[in-house]
Swiss-Prot record:
SUPFAM superfamilies: CAD & PB1 domains, Protein kinase-like (PK-like). Residues 64-68 are annotated as: Interaction with MAP3K2/MAP3K3. ATP binds at L172, G173, H174, G175, N176, G177, G178, T179, V180, K195. It comes from Rattus norvegicus. Interacts with PARD6A, MAP3K3 and MAPK7. Forms a complex with SQSTM1 and PRKCZ or PRKCI. GO terms for biological process: cellular response to growth factor stimulus; ERK5 cascade; heart development; insulin-like growth factor receptor signaling pathway; MAPK cascade; negative regulation of canonical NF-kappaB signal transduction; negative regulation of cell migration involved in sprouting angiogenesis; negative regulation of chemokine (C-X-C motif) ligand 2 production. This is Dual specificity mitogen-activated protein kinase kinase 5. Keywords: ATP-binding, Cytoplasm, Kinase, Magnesium, Membrane, Metal-binding, Nucleotide-binding, Phosphoprotein, Serine/threonine-protein kinase, Transferase, Tyrosine-protein kinase.
């Protein structure tokens, strides 16, 4: 059996190993190891001890190809586990599959108490048997777990995401101020989306933007896109986020109301979450609403960084067609301005066209200010009642009131009959619609 183990071990000598330590009832912690084949049983127990300091752990388990749990209590059993895992990784690489972390399950552990261990990352570059300490790893943070502010500083200081670890694949789209790519993160084996924005700003402003982006690590909502990190290379900022295989809503045609209702619920919940953190989105529009084939709906590109918002505005001159009248007029911006943008976005998604026919959005949503003056001067557009339900028409009408204070507050949005009607957790409706739309798009494009 020894010669069988040598092949995978030698092949994986320079490969980063990510061990996912499963915590009972509390999620998981990822541990990145740069000397995987030399890893000893005691090394793993030491790290488990850091993750679960209140428990006594003498062994751990992993799952084989049949899903059976195999116990590891010694270096010999540790080598057998690594050999099995590396063989699996080599098969995944040959088949072009994504590499999954090695999952282990600590044994004889008491559940951890209320401690701030969520999102802990451990990174060891040391040789075997050397004790490790919790520092930031190269693996992607789990966007379902919150991070402490101390860890955030480590993440940004250690450059968790960097260009050398990213392989760009396809161009997903060109937004206002940047290009979005589908990319592969080598250390973790994850697919992600990377938005690259060219900015003519000073090094000091770059540092301020990175500091402001820290709050994205604290976002813990299933309706907000997962944020993995950001970095500057010269005058380009790259923002790395979760990849959504359905893309943004601006590329879809007219959306049926029963689908749009479920999407609206998710968007309102996402906005309400941001507002609870005192974050204004500032750029609510269909291209910043993402969907996937699982039926999830998530918001992206919200204005957590004032400096980034201002820098993009200075670099890319124009006015957003989804802006509320008070923003176009240069007045104060608030939650109610986001609500207007919510209303005009869903009106467009329902109609299949921009609600103001005199405004042509063929060249994107940025345009000269004078073209948008009609939004300030004219009455708000209204949906035809015979074509849509009364609750939906009322929802849009309320969101698009010209006076900001007359628009619904966050709690009023969640309690609106249109939102209540579709707040049933039925992701299957959105999933089926996304899958069908993607299939139609592929059939129209024909074979490559």
């Amino acid at each position: 059996m020894l010669w069988l183990a040598l092949g995978p071990f030698r092949a994986m000598e320079n490969q980063v190993l990510v061990i996912r330590i499963k915590i009972p009832n509390s999620g998981a912690v990822d541990w990145t190891v740069h000397s995987g084949p030399q890893l000893l049983f005691r090394d793993v127990l030491d790290v488990i001890g850091q993750v679960l300091p209140e428990a006594t752990t003498t062994a751990f388990e992993y799952e084989d190809e049949d899903g059976d749990r195999i116990t590891v209590r010694s270096d010999e059993e540790m080598k057998a586990m690594l050999s099995y895992y590396y063989s699996t990784v080599m098969e995944q690489q040959v088949n072009g599959q994504l590499i999954e972390p090695l999952q282990i399950f600590p044994r004889a552990c008491k559940p951890p108490g209320e401690r701030n261990i969520h999102g802990l990352k451990v990174n060891t570059r040391a040789g075997p048997s050397q004790h490790t300490s919790p520092v930031v790893s190269d693996s992607l943070p789990s966007n379902s777990l919150k991070k402490s502010s101390a860890e955030l500083r480590k993440i940004l200081a250690n450059g968790q995401m960097n260009e050398q670890d990213i392989r760009y694949r396809d161009t997903l789209g060109h937004g206002n101020g940047g290009t979005v790519y589908k990319a592969y993160h080598v250390p973790s084996g994850k697919i992600l989306a990377v938005k690259v924005i060219l900015l003519d700003i000073t090094l000091e402003l770059q540092k301020q933007i990175m500091s402001e982006l820290e709050i994205l690590y604290k976002c813990d909502s299933s309706y907000i896109i997962g944020f993995y990190g950001a970095f500057f290379v010269e005058n380009r900022i790259s923002i790395c986020t979760e990849f959504m295989d359905g893309g943004s809503l601006d590329v879809y045609r007219k959306i049926p109301e029963h689908v749009l209702g479920r999407i609206a619920v998710a968007v309102v919940k996402g906005l309400t979450y941001l507002w609870s953190l005192k974050i204004l989105h500032r750029d609510v529009k269909p291209s910043n609403m993402l969907v996937n084939t699982s039926g999830q709906v998530k918001l992206c590109d919200f204005g957590v960084s004032t400096q980034l918002v201002n820098s993009i505005a200075k670099t890319y001159v124009g006015t957003n067609a989804y802006m509320a009248p008070e923003r176009i007029s240069g007045e104060q911006y608030g939650i109610h301005s986001d609500v207007w943008s919510l209303g005009i976005s869903f009106m467009e998604l329902a109609l299949g066209r921009f609600p103001y026919p005199q405004i042509q959005k063929n060249q994107g949503s940025l345009m000269p200010l004078q073209l948008l003056q009609c939004i300030v001067d004219e009455d708000s557009p209204v949906l035809p009642l015979g074509e849509f339900s009364e609750p939906f028409v009322h929802f849009i009408t309320q969101c698009m009131r010209k006076q900001p204070k007359e628009r619904p507050a966050p709690e009023e949005l969640m309690g609106h009959p249109f939102i209540v009607q579709f707040n049933d957790g039925n992701a299957t409706v959105v999933s089926m619609w996304v899958c069908r739309a993607l299939e139609e798009r592929r059939s129209q494009q024909g074979p490559p």
